[in-house]
Amino acid sequence: MSLRRIMVTAVRNLHPVTLLPSPRINILYGSNGSGKTSVLEAVHLLGLARSFRSTRLNPVIQYEQAACTVFGEVQLTEGGTSNLGVSRERQGEFTIRIDGQNARSAAQLAELLPLQLINPDSFRLLEGAPKIRRQFLDWGVFHVEPRFLPAWQRLQKALRQRNSWLRHGTLDPASQAAWDRELCLASAEIDEYRRNYIKALKPVFERTLSELVELDGLTLSYYRGWDKDRELQEVLASSLLRDQQMGHTQAGPQRADLRLRLAGNNAADILSRGQQKLVVCALRIAQGHLVSQARRGHCIYLVDDLPSELDDQHRRALCRLLEELRCQVFITCVDHELLREGWQTETPVALFHVEQGRITQTHDHRE
C-alpha cells in the first residue's frame, strides 16, 4: 500500500497543503526548522493517531487554530483505495474516520497503514527501556499474526484485575485463581506469537545488517519475561508475597525484552551512534520484509534526517535497501543532492522543498 494523496491542515507550522507523493521515494528538503519533520509527523498521525515528537497532541495543533486534520487516500495492495482521516481538537476530542465511518480504535488505522519510523531518536530502541523494545516487537507481531491483538487485549485485562487485587485485595480466592488462569493462558499465547516472530525476524535482520555494516558476533535474543524453564503459574505462586508488596505483577509478557549483545556486552554500550543507527535501520527494514511476506503489501517508511551520523557509503547502502523493499518512503534532509542520485533510474522519485511551512513540489515523479 501507499499514500496517493495527503491533505494537511493546521499541523504545527505547516501551511494547508495537498501532496501527491510518489509511490516509492519522496524527499523533503529545506533548512532546519522549515517544517520537514512536521510532514512526517502528519503522516505518523494519520497512521497511528499519535505524534512521535510529543506525548501530547496539543502542541501539534497550529497556534490559534481549534483543531488539526490529516487526510490520506491509500492505494491498497489488492486494488482500490481507502480514505483515512484523523482530526484532533484543542479541547481534546479526537476523531478517526475510515471510508466515511468512525473507527473504533487506532488499531484499525495501524492495520491499514503500517508505518516504520527511523529518526535521530532511533538509538533509544537499543539504549532505552525494555518497553520500547516490546513496542517494536509487538508492532511486528501485530502485522503478521491476526490473533495477536485479541490475545494482547485479554492479557491486559487479566493484568489489570490481578494488579488491582494485589494492591487492594478486592477479589475472593476463587476469582483471583480464575484471573490467574486467564493471565497464564493469554501469556502463553503471546509468548508463542513473539517467539515465532523472532525466529522469522533473526535471519532477515542478520542478512540486512551484513549489507549495512560489519558487526561480527552481534546477537539478537528474546527474553519472554519469566524463567524459560518454569511455568508462569509456578512463578506467580512463588512470587505472590513479593508482588503484593510491590503492588504489581513482576513476571509475565509485560516484562519481555529483546537483547542485542556484542562480545558478551550490551551492544548499546560499545557501538558508536552511527553503528547504533545502522543496527536499528536493519531491524526496521527486516520488519518491513516480514510485513511484505505476510500481507503481500508494504510498510511506509518515515526517515527523518537520513544523512545524519552516516557517511556516504552507509547512506547509499541504506538507500539501496529501502529501494529494494519497493515500498513508499518519505525522507527528510537539508541538502537533497546528498540523496537525489542514490536511486535507480527507473525508481520514481519526488522532491518537495519545505520553507517556513510552505511545501513546493520541485520534481514530480510522473514527469
From Swiss-Prot:
The keyword Transmembrane does not apply. ATP binds at residues 30-37. GO terms for cellular component: cytoplasm. One of its GO terms (biological process) is SOS response. InterPro entries: DNA-binding_RecF, DNA-binding_RecF_CS, P-loop_NTPase, RecF/RecN/SMC_N, RecF_2. The keyword Membrane does not apply. Keywords: ATP-binding, Cytoplasm, DNA damage, DNA repair, DNA replication, DNA-binding, Nucleotide-binding, SOS response. One of its GO terms (molecular function) is single-stranded DNA binding. Pfam families: SMC_N. It is found in: Cytoplasm. It comes from the Bacteria. The RecF protein is involved in DNA metabolism; it is required for DNA replication and normal SOS inducibility. RecF binds preferentially to single-stranded, linear DNA. It also seems to bind ATP. Belongs to the RecF family. This is DNA replication and repair protein RecF. It comes from Pseudomonas putida (strain ATCC 700007 / DSM 6899 / JCM 31910 / BCRC 17059 / LMG 24140 / F1).
